[in-house]
C-alpha cells in the first residue's frame, strides 16, 4: 500500500514546454535545490540563455534529435527513466544505464492556437499534433507513485514550495497526475474535433469547408461544485463549467449566501443572459427560468432602482423567491429596496458596491453574485440539450434585430415610442419559454404569457397577468416569439388594447393576420427571425 504522506525528493527533472510562462524561474528554483535538469529544443535554449545548466536530451541519450524535431524524447533512457518502478525495475534500469527521472514538466504544442489561425492548412494542423509531449505526460502520470508530472505553469510555485519541504506527497503527485490526464484528454479531444470536421467525401482532403459538427464530439468541463440535489431532491447533481469568453453565471463570484442550487444556477443564467440584452440600466426578475418582470430606464432617470421598481410591479407575486439580475453596479439603495420588499433567492450584477454588500448581509441566506462586465457584442458559442441516448447541439441564439431590420406589414406604421417598446418586448420574448407572448409599455413588461401549448392562450395569460398587477394594457405593444398561425391572437390583442405587434412572420395565414391588425388599427412589424425557447 502506498504511503500517502511520505515525501519523495526530486533529483532529476525533464522540462520541455511550449508555453514557457514562468519556466525560467521554475527551473532556477529546481537548480538551486540541486536538481539536474534535462531539456529539449526551444526550452533548452531559453534555459541556457538564462544561465541555467540544463542538459540537452540529445546529449543525455546519445541519440540526436531528428526528422525536423518529430523524434526528440522517444528514447528508452527517457521513458525508462520516467516509467521505471523504483521498487521493481531498479536492476533493469541499472543494467541499461537508465537513471530515474523524478519530475516531468511538459505542456503541449499549441494545436488550438494553430488551427484558429486564418489559412491554417491540414499539413499545418498535423505538424502541430504533439507526440513526444503526450507520451511523456502519460508516462509520468501513469507512474505517479514515483514521478511528479507538471502540465500547468500555475502549479510551479506549489511544487517548488513542497520540494523545499522535503518533496511531494503521494496525494500531491496523484493530483498532478489527474491534471495531466485531463490535459491530454482535452488535447486529444481538440484534435479529434478538428479532424472529424474535415470533409472526407473528396479525395483531396481540405480544411476549407470544415464542418462545425465533427464525427465525434468532445468537450471538457471542469467541476465547479457538487450540489445537494438536482432539479428535484431525488436527483443527484453537480455544476460543471467551461472557459467562457464573457462574464456569465459560470464565472460569477459568490459574495455571500447559501450554496447555489441546481435551479438557482439555471434561473440565474436565464436572468443574466436576458439583462445582457440591454444597454441602458435594466432589471430582470426570473422565476422558473422565465422572466416575470423586466424594465429598462433611460440613463440618469432613476437608474437600476427605478428599473427594479418597474420590473417588480409587473408581477410581484411571481417575483417572490425569484432571481434578480442587473446590468449596472448594485448600489445600496437598490439593495435596500429589494431586501425590504421581497424574498429573493439570488441577486446578480456586474459589480456590487460595498454599501449593497452591507445591506444584503442582513439577509444571510440571500445569494449575492458579482459576475464582472461583459462586452457589448455577444460571444458565439454552443447550447446543449440532453435527450435520452443523445445530445442536441446548436449555436447560441445571439441573433438580435434593430429598427432597420423591421418590416412594416400593416397600413399603419408604428410610432417612434411603439418601435422602442416593440424592440424591448422582442428582446424579452427571446428569453420566455415558448409559446411566448410579452406585453410591454414604456420599456416595462406589463404582462408575460409563457410556456403555453397554444399561442392565443399565452396572449390571454399575459392580459390576465397585467390586469392582476393593475397595469394598463391599453396602448401597450405585444411581442410573439414565433408567427401567429391564425388571426385569433391579433383579435385578442386588439380587445386587450394592444396597439402594435412584433413577430417573425412566415405563417401560411400571414395575410389573414395582417388583415386582422389592419381592421383593428394595429401596427405590425415582421422580424424574419424566430426565437423558440424550449
Curated annotation (Swiss-Prot):
Keywords: Hydrolase, Multifunctional enzyme, Purine biosynthesis, Transferase. Pathway: Purine metabolism; IMP biosynthesis via de novo pathway; 5-formamido-1-(5-phospho-D-ribosyl)imidazole-4-carboxamide from 5-amino-1-(5-phospho-D-ribosyl)imidazole-4-carboxamide (10-formyl THF route): step 1/1; Purine metabolism; IMP biosynthesis via de novo pathway; IMP from 5-formamido-1-(5-phospho-D-ribosyl)imidazole-4-carboxamide: step 1/1. Pfam families: AICARFT_IMPCHas (PF01808), MGS (PF02142). It catalyses: (6R)-10-formyltetrahydrofolate + 5-amino-1-(5-phospho-beta-D-ribosyl)imidazole-4-carboxamide = 5-formamido-1-(5-phospho-D-ribosyl)imidazole-4-carboxamide + (6S)-5,6,7,8-tetrahydrofolate; IMP + H2O = 5-formamido-1-(5-phospho-D-ribosyl)imidazole-4-carboxamide. Gene3D superfamilies: 3.40.140.20, Methylglyoxal synthase-like domain. Disulfide bonds: none annotated. One of its GO terms (molecular function) is IMP cyclohydrolase activity. CDD domains: IMPCH. It comes from the Bacteria. Its EC number is 2.1.2.3, 3.5.4.10. Residues 6-151 form the MGS-like domain. One of its GO terms (biological process) is 'de novo' IMP biosynthetic process. The keyword Transferase applies. One of its GO terms (cellular component) is cytosol. The IMP cyclohydrolase activity resides in the N-terminal region. Belongs to the PurH family. NCBIfam families: PRK00881.1 (NF002049), purH (TIGR00355). This is Bifunctional purine biosynthesis protein PurH. It comes from Stutzerimonas stutzeri (strain A1501) (Pseudomonas stutzeri).
